[in-house]
Amino acid sequence: MEAAETEAEAAALEVLAEVAGILEPVGLQEEAELPAKILVEFVVDSQKKDKLLCSQLQVADFLQNILAQEDTAKGLDPLASEDTSRQKAIAAKEQWKELKATYREHVEAIKIGLTKALTQMEEAQRKRTQLREAFEQLQAKKQMAMEKRRAVQNQWQLQQEKHLQHLAEVSAEVRERKTGTQQELDRVFQKLGNLKQQAEQERDKLQRYQTFLQLLYTLQGKLLFPEAEAEAENLPDDKPQQPTRPQEQSTGDTMGRDPGVSFKAVGLQPAGDVNLP
């Protein structure tokens, strides 16, 4: 305790000496030489220092009073009190050293942790920057891919439209050709029908002519000439053949069916060659 009082008194004396040095009168000549601004700053600074010194003196006086009251209350011997104070001061000093060492250890640990944290923060910042750059690159690639996809879709759509248009043109051309071909086929079939009808008519005429010739040669007592027989055999049998009848019945039927032809045949016969049955 005594050492603490001594230190407090020494500090108080130092403070008083500083106050005395600050409060020394300054000569009128020096004051006249100093500029007004510096004087104002000096006065303000002096007032601040005065307030600080007064507060320090009050604290020192308060501590001295507390120490004196403690010594009076305990009623200890001054020598024993001095030894006790010395031991307490030594213990406090040792404790202070331990606290200081612990503080330094903690400070070192904090520094190490702070260094690691700063390193980790820098690494995290670097990774964050890399991730941001990668994300930006990914966004750019995505945008490019979307643009390419849109371009491909547009191109495909245009190709499909052109293809559909071409198919429509080809289909229209095919339909037109089909219509023309169908019309041509209809004309051909119609012409073929007409030709068939004409052929039927010509065949009927030829059949009548052959029948007439056969009747004529029968009436004359001669057979058909070989060329007529061969031609008659080569004729197609499109119509059902009538059953064979006697010559008289056939002649009568023929004359009955075509009186004009019979009369013509009779008129063309020579009179001397007619052989009646």
UniProtKB/Swiss-Prot annotation:
Record text on subunit structure and interactions: Component of the KNL1 complex composed of KNL1 and ZWINT. Part of the ten-subunit outer kinetochore KMN network that includes the KNL1, MIS12 and NDC80 complexes; a bioriented kinetochore contains approximately 150 copies of the network. Interacts with the MIS12 complex subunits MIS12 DSN1, and PMF1. Interacts with the NDC80 complex subunit NDC80 during mitosis. Interacts with ZW10. Interacts with CETN3.
Location, primary (coarse class): nucleus
Coiled coil: 104-217
This protein's record includes keyword Nucleus: yes
Cellular component, GO, one term: Knl1/Spc105 complex
Protein known as: Outer kinetochore KNL1 complex subunit ZWINT
Subcellular location per the Swiss-Prot or TrEMBL entry: Nucleus; Chromosome, Centromere, Kinetochore
Its biological purpose: Acts as a component of the outer kinetochore KNL1 complex that serves as a docking point for spindle assembly checkpoint components and mediates microtubule-kinetochore interactions. Kinetochores, consisting of a centromere-associated inner segment and a microtubule-contacting outer segment, play a crucial role in chromosome segregation by mediating the physical connection between centromeric DNA and spindle microtubules.
Biological process, per Gene Ontology: cell division; establishment of localization in cell; homologous chromosome orientation in meiotic metaphase I; mitotic sister chromatid segregation; mitotic spindle assembly checkpoint signaling; regulation of meiosis I spindle assembly checkpoint
Top-level taxon of the source organism: Eukaryota
Keyword Coiled coil set for record: yes
Sequence segments annotated as region (Disordered): 228-277
Organism: Homo sapiens (Human)
Biased composition (Polar residues): 241-253
Location of region: Interaction with NDC80 and ZW10: 80-155
Keyword terms of this UniProt record: Cell cycle, Cell division, Centromere, Chromosome, Coiled coil, Kinetochore, Mitosis, Nucleus
